[in-house]
């Protein structure tokens, strides 16, 4: 099968679409990737790519074709320019780079922005190939939830764009079943929607058992009960509520909060830690490669996932949930809806309502006071549930089957 994968983000940027490409290639399919130049998350072109672009033209047996784009940089205007520059160059150069090639199917990984799908719509008609779209963020809902767009007129325009894109897709894969109503509202074709959740990355196949040493960065925290947050530090993660919980437990000397990651609101979080005088219990450890996350998780008493109290966020399962489950550590959830349901259904930890700093503090105290055997049992249930519900091999086999079925219908 000849598959074109289109994604604004791709290796060496860390996204699960990388594993889709490597697995399809390993299963004998001819995969071509059309993507941009790597600049996420720092917003600057990767130095290694800048020095030797040719070294990034092949990945796991797949050919990688890259188009220019404006790096994300800092600030809203540069982000908008980044989004639209990919649309422009992928639409302009994509057909030229792919001239003379035919494909059995086109697969698009659509984390934000939804605009990145537009070149695929064009290529679908040029190549006469079916288009499969993996929806990881719901637009326009996400834009209003994080406060990026407040104008109803502009949100309605984005909604029309989303409807246009969905109607040109042959199959729409939703990362959460909670996405179905919104997708079907804009597509007006419920028969096209399928459930395709995220999974734990291959880096977590090693587990975090006793034979795995903790990260060296945790040596000063090894005798404490550590609440660890790992991932993007953004508006959606509601760090004011997390710091509210930390402030409520500021006098609990055995409890520490470790933040592993970076993001657009990281400077504001650092300032808040200083302002609230939480430097003795809240520590920002910076961003580290995904490959090192198991050794960081090894030193965690519990792994924290949070989302703001917005209706749209109650529909999503944050990608870190699957990684946390695979780590075999208790989970702490300060979120509503689908993400909370997974934790409760798995018996993998404790949850409180989104935005509830007091509730999170209470959950932390409950976990800290539990016996280690009880917490270990939570971790085992987490791993078992993750393997049952989010098995990587099964899910990648499913997307392969959908691509093959779509190709036969053309």
For each feature predicted by the language model, list its residue ranges.
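Carbohydrate-associated surface elements
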Residues: 37, 178, 198-199
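Conserved donor-binding/catalytic core segment of Leloir-type glycosyltransferases
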Residues: 200, 215-237, 243-246, 258
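Nucleotide-activated donor-binding/catalytic signature segment of Leloir-type glycosyltransferases, i.e.
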Residues: 253, 258-260, 267-294
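N-terminal subdomain of nucleotide-sugar transferases
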Residues: 1-60
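A charged, aromatic-enriched C-terminal amphipathic alpha-helix characteristic of glycosyltransferases
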Residues: 355, 359, 372-403
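Acidic donor-binding loop of glycosyltransferase active sites
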Residues: 170, 281, 297-314, 329
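Membrane-proximal helix-turn-helix segments that form the acceptor-binding/catalytic region
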Residues: 115, 122-126, 152-172
């Amino acid at each position: 099968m000849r598959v074109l994968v289109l994604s604004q983000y791709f290796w060496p940027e860390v996204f699960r679409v990388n594993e889709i490409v490597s697995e399809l290639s390993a299963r004998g399919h001819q995969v071509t990737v059309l993507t941009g130049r790597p600049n996420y998350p720092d917003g600057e072109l990767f130095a290694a790519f800048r020095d030797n672009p040719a070294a990034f033209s092949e990945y796991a047996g797949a050919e990688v074709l890259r188009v220019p784009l404006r790096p994300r940089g800092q600030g809203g205007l540069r982000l908008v320019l980044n989004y639209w520059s990919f649309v422009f160059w992928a639409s302009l150069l994509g057909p030229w780079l792919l001239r003379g090639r035919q494909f059995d199917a086109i697969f698009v990984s659509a984390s934000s922005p939804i605009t990145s799908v537009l070149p695929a719509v064009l290529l679908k008609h040029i190549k006469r190939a079916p288009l499969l779209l993996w929806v990881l963020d719901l637009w326009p809902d996400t834009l209003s939830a994080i406060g990026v767009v407040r104008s109803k007129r502009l949100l309605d325009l984005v909604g029309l764009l989303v409807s246009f894109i969905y109607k040109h897709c042959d199959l729409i894969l939703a990362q959460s079943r909670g996405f179905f109503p919104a997708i079907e509202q804009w597509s007006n074709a419920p028969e096209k929607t399928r459930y395709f959740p995220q999974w734990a990355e291959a880096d977590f196949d090693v587990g975090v058992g006793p034979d795995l040493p903790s990260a060296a960065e945790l040596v000063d925290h090894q005798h404490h009960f550590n609440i660890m947050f790992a991932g993007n530090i953004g508006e959606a993660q509601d760090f004011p509520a997390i710091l509210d919980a930390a402030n409520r437990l500021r006098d609990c000397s055995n409890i520490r909060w470790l933040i592993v990651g970076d993001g657009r609101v990281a400077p504001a979080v650092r300032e808040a830690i200083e302002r609230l005088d939480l430097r003795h219990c809240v520590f920002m450890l910076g961003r580290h490669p995904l490959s090192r996350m198991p050794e960081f998780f090894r030193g965690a008493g519990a792994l924290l996932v949070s989302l703001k109290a917005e209706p749209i966020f109650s529909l999503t399962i944050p990608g870190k949930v699957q990684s946390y489950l695979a780590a075999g550590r208790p989970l702490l959830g300060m979120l509503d809806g689908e993400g909370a349901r997974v934790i409760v259904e798995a018996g993998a930890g404790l949850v409180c309502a989104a935005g509830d700093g007091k509730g999170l503090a209470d959950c932390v105290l409950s976990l800290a006071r539990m016996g280690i055997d009880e917490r270990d049992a939570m971790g085992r249930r987490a791993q078992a549930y993750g393997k049952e519900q989010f098995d990587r091999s099964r899910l990648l086999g499913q997307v392969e089957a959908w691509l093959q079925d779509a190709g036969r219908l053309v």
